[in-house]
Amino acid sequence: MNLALFDLDNTLLDGDAETLWFEYLHQAGHLEGNFFGKLEEFTNDYDQEELDFSEYLNFILLPLKKWGPEKVKPWREQFLLEKIEPRLRYQNILHDHRRQGHVLVLITASHDFLAEPIGQMLEMDFTLSTRPEIIDGIYTGKVHEACFRKGKVEILNEFLDIQGFKPNKTWFYSDSQNDLPLMRNCDHPVAVHPDQNLRI
C-alpha cells in the first residue's frame, strides 16, 4: 500500500484553522477581549521555530475549557460551513491519490475537535491530530499527544504499527519548516506554498 499524508494549515486549507476558529467565535459574539495580539505572538514564535506548544494549546483551548464541547459543537458546525469549506483547496491532488488507491491521511498540529470534522469534509481515510487531555469530559488545557514537529513522526509511526500498515511509498504535502522531521522521513516530500525557511 502507498500512503499520502497532508498537512492542513496553509496547505490544504488557505489559512490556519485555529486562528479562523477564534476569529469566528469573536465575530459571532462568543468571545470578547483582545486575543489577536496573543495569537500573533504565537504565530511569530511558530514561524521562528520557537513555539511553546503546550502554552499555545492551553490558550487555543479556551473556548472548550470555558463552555465544554457539547455547547460548542453547534458553533463548530456553522464555522466549518462558513470559514473552512470555502477555503479548502487542492482537491485535485486528493482525487489523484485517491484514484490510485493510496491511503489518505490528514496529519495536523490542530487539535482533534477541529481536525476530525475537517478530515471528514476532505474524505480522508484517517486523521491524525493533536489530542488534548480530557478528564471527566472536561478539557484540562494540557496535551495528551502533540502532533507537532517530531511528534508528527512519532504519532505516524504509532498509527502505522496499530494499523499494521507497511507503506511501499509515502508522500507528504506541507508548507512549513516545522514539518521537516516528517518530510525527511517520506519518499516524496512536497512543499506547498512553502514558508521562507522551507523555501531555502
Residue ranges and their predicted role:
Residues M1, P74, L81-I200:
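C-terminal cap/substrate-recognition subdomain and adjoining C-terminal extension
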Residues D7-L8, F59, T127, I138:
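Residue-level signal for pocket-adjacent positions within structured domains
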Residues L13, Q27, Q48, L61-K65, ...:
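Amphipathic alpha-helical interaction elements
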Residues E55-R89:
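Metal-dependent phosphoesterase signature
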Residues M1-Q48:
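Active-site neighborhood of HAD-like aspartate-dependent phosphohydrolases
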Residues T43-G68, F126-T127, R131:
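Short, compositionally biased "basic patch" segments
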Residues F22-E23, L61, E77, D187:
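Amphipathic alpha-helical segments within well-ordered protein domains
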